[in-house]
């Protein structure tokens, strides 16, 4: 590939992100009412949309001079829609979207800085109420905050308490204990596998790989935002990839077909009772409650595992997802009024009640609700997973390139390639690093 072609590709990826929001702002009508368009990516199921409708109605009642038009965007179509509508330059006033979008849009000079909201939160104590400083630091680039966090999306490992008890095992806390427990509980003859995880070339595969990278002492960026995936972090990242994929290739404790699994495929097998350990989203809690309530009391959530990096590496990948405002919105101040109202402790409780576990508040003060206290798995996720959840870029932040690395599934491919058998862990890591490196040159 020539240098000119490579630059064109990179610009098409980074520069082509803006097109999702080709809907257009509504502005101010003849009656002086500000009409705002609000695009959502992860609040679009019928249940969540109904709950959101009530939240938006409450805002409009409290702010009669502002109306909100909610427009859902299918998560499966987000990236194609970005590229298809890149030339539209007609974005909504407000959006909630994928984790790194504010930085990518800021690189296009399309984002309104959110420094004033961060300053407000700092002055009123709300910033200290957020679980992790990386929830907002991730949106800091070139001296400005380009988004603010509103939601946390976690990646727990679930386990069957009854199957471990039958083998005389305690819930594992280390890599070694986890591997041994997955092997001991694997009984495909009885329709139960030791572990199930999504190894298809989908975004979810890299989420769990990221957790093991942290636990091995690896990562993608260093604290200064430099790419280290295949350099100083190479050995740790290879070790993490080997540990994860060995479950399928060496120990053979996973069901057939995980190389084609996306999120719901692996979670479905666990919800059906066909695996001792299941890698999933927080939404697994809701699925257990709805689809197999008899299994609920037999399921627990693991502590974040300790790997080669020791206690300091007990971290798990998660997403602090953003809200942001279009730079050219005619209703920027009204949009910020909405965001400041929307992101308040307790405000989104109707959403959290609708799909337990799928969405998590970012505020520490939201954890003591009756909703959490009355649900054992929510409490376990809260104490065992949420405090250890951090961003993909950790310990770095503020790199728009991370949106491309995540969006193009650059470290999901290694998981799939090793499970399928087309590459060794070392080659898969180095090939991925070389693709990432093109974004930083």
PLM regions with names:
Residues 54-130, 162-173, 269-277, 293-294:
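Extracytoplasmic "Venus flytrap"/periplasmic binding protein-like
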Residues 165, 249, 387-441:
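Conserved C-terminal helix/tail region of periplasmic/extracytoplasmic solute-binding proteins
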Residues 182-184, 226-258:
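Glycine-centered hinge/linker elements that transmit conformational signals in sensory
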Residues 119, 283-295, 308-410:
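C-terminal lobe and pocket-closing loops
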Residues 115-131, 199, 216-239, 290-294, ...:
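Short, solvent-exposed loop/beta-turn-alpha elements that line the ligand-binding surface or hinge
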Residues 2-20:
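N-terminal secretory signal peptides and thylakoid transit peptides that target proteins
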């Amino acid at each position: 590939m020539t240098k000119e072609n490579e630059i064109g590709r990179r610009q098409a990826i980074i520069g082509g992100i803006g097109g999702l929001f080709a809907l257009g702002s509504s502005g101010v009508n003849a009656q002086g009412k500000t009409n705002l368009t609000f695009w959502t990516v992860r609040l679009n199921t019928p249940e969540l949309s109904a709950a959101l409708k009530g939240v938006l109605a409450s805002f409009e009642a409290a702010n009669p001079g502002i109306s909100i038009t909610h427009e859902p965007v299918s998560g499966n179509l987000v990236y194609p829609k970005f590229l298809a509508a890149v030339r539209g330059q007609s974005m909504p006033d407000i959006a909630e979207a994928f984790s790194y979008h504010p930085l990518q849009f800021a690189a296009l000079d399309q984002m309104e800085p959110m420094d004033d909201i961060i300053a407000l939160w700092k002055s009123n104590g709300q910033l200290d109420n957020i679980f992790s400083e990386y929830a907002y630091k991730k949106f800091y680039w070139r001296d400005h905050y380009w988004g603010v966090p509103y939601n946390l999306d976690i990646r727990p490992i679930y386990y069957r308490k009854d199957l471990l008890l039958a083998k005389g095992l305690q819930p594992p806390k280390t890599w070694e204990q986890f591997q041994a427990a997955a092997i001991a509980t694997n009984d495909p003859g009885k329709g139960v596998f030791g572990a199930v995880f999504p190894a298809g070339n989908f975004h979810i595969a890299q989420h769990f790989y990221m957790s093991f990278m942290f636990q091995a002492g690896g990562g993608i960026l260093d604290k200064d935002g430099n790419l280290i995936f295949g350099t100083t972090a190479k050995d740790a990242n290879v070790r993490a990839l080997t540990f994860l994929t060995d479950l399928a290739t060496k120990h053979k404790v996973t069901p057939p077909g995980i190389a084609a699994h996306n999120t719901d495929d692996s979670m479905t097998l666990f919800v059906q009772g066909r695996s001792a350990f299941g890698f999933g989203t927080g939404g697994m809690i809701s699925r257990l409650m709805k689809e197999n309530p008899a299994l609920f009391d037999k399921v627990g959530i693991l502590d974040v595992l300790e790997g080669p990096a020791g206690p300091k590496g007990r971290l798990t990948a998660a997403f602090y997802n953003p809200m942001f405002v279009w730079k050219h919105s005619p209703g920027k101040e009204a949009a910020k009024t909405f965001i400041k109202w929307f992101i308040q402790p307790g405000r989104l409780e109707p959403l959290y009640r609708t799909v337990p576990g799928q969405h998590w508040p970012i505020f520490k003060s939201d954890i003591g609700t009756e909703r959490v206290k009355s649900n054992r798995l929510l409490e376990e996720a809260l104490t065992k997973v949420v405090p250890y959840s951090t961003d993909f870029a950790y310990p770095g932040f503020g790199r728009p390139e991370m949106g491309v690395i995540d969006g193009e599934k650059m470290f999901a491919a290694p998981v799939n390639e090793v499970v399928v058998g087309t590459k060794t862990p070392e080659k898969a890591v180095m090939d991925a690093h070389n693709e990432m490196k093109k974004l930083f040159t």
